Curated annotation (Swiss-Prot):
Location(s) in or outside the cell: Cytoplasm
Keyword field: Cytoplasm, DNA-binding, Transcription, Transcription regulation
Cellular component GO terms held in the UniProt record: cytosol
Similarity comment: Belongs to the TACO1 family.
Keyword DNA-binding: yes
Superkingdom of origin organism: Bacteria
InterPro entries reported for this sequence: Integrase-like_N, TACO1_YebC-like_2nd/3rd_dom, TACO1_YebC_N, Transcrip_reg_TACO1-like, Transcrip_reg_TACO1-like_dom3, YebC-like
Name listed for the protein in its UniProt record: Probable transcriptional regulatory protein CFF8240_0424
A UniProt-annotated Pfam family: TACO1_YebC_N
Species this protein is from: Campylobacter fetus subsp. fetus (strain 82-40)
Matches recorded under SUPFAM superfamilies: YebC-like
Length: 235
């Protein structure tokens, strides 16, 4: 998703009722990370980052601990991360990231949302060549030299860095998530958010009318309980 459109969508996240919308998604991200890499944060960079992201959103410690414990529960083995591809009007391409214990339910819901809101599902993997998977971290901008920070993190896998309103967005290839996470920690940077995301290789520039037309579809997808993230090629 283009950065300008991403910031626009972030304003919606800020308005979400955290208890009913954001916290369950953060909790599921923690459980999935713990299930994939173990429940010890010291040995699991993805889990450490998921916890840091939750803390940055003021998620209570009890919720975080419960999410980690669920990774060892009898139901956790059924939770899977599944991606669905789709398209909408104006050349918009969409990748939907889900975490679900019932893929049959999830695919039916996602397909219904697309079909009822002017979109269409595509075979899974259809858009892989249109997007690049990246490790992306948002950190509080430190007081020191940004160029020096950039040089320090290149060896850890940094490929790009952006600055916006006191926040640094750090990019790396998805295979560098662990080393980049550790490099950021070693530098003492405060993580606001960290995850693997799909970034479009090319974008479409839409006017306000077209964006308004598409936002209903995107809202419906993001509001589904099984959906963790929605990525688009909108500038």
């Amino acid at each position: 998703m283009g950065r300008a459109f991403e910031y626009r969508r972030a304003s919606k996240e800020a308005r979400w009722d955290k208890m009913s919308k954001l916290f369950p998604k953060l909790s599921k991200a923690i459980t999935v990370a713990a299930k994939e890499g173990g429940i010890d944060p010291d040995m699991n960079p993805k889990l450490r980052t998921a916890i840091a992201t939750a803390k940055a959103q003021n998620m209570p410690k009890d919720n975080i601990d419960a999410a980690i414990k669920r990774a060892n529960g009898k139901d956790s083995s059924d939770i899977k991360t599944i991606f669905y591809d789709g398209k909408a009007a104006h050349g918009v391409q969409i990748i939907v990231e889900t975490a679900t214990d019932n893929p049959t339910r999830t695919v039916a819901n996602v397909k219904s949302i697309f079909s009822k809101n002017g979109g269409e599902m595509l075979p899974s993997g259809s858009l892989n060549f249109m997007f690049s998977r990246k490790a992306i971290f948002e950190v509080v901008k430190p007081s020191g030299d940004i160029e020096e920070l950039e040089l320090e993190l290149i060896d850890a896998g940094l490929t790009d860095i952006e600055e916006n309103d006191g926040t640094l967005t750090i990019y790396g290839d998805y295979t560098s998530f662990g080393t980049l996470s550790e490099g950021i920690e070693k530098m003492g940077l405060e993580v606001k958010k960290g995850s693997l995301q799909f970034i479009p290789n090319s974008t479409v520039n839409l006017d306000e009318s077209a964006i308004g037309e598409l936002e209903r579809l995107l809202d419906k997808l993001e509001d589904d309980d099984d959906v963790q993230a929605v990525y688009t090629n909108i500038e």
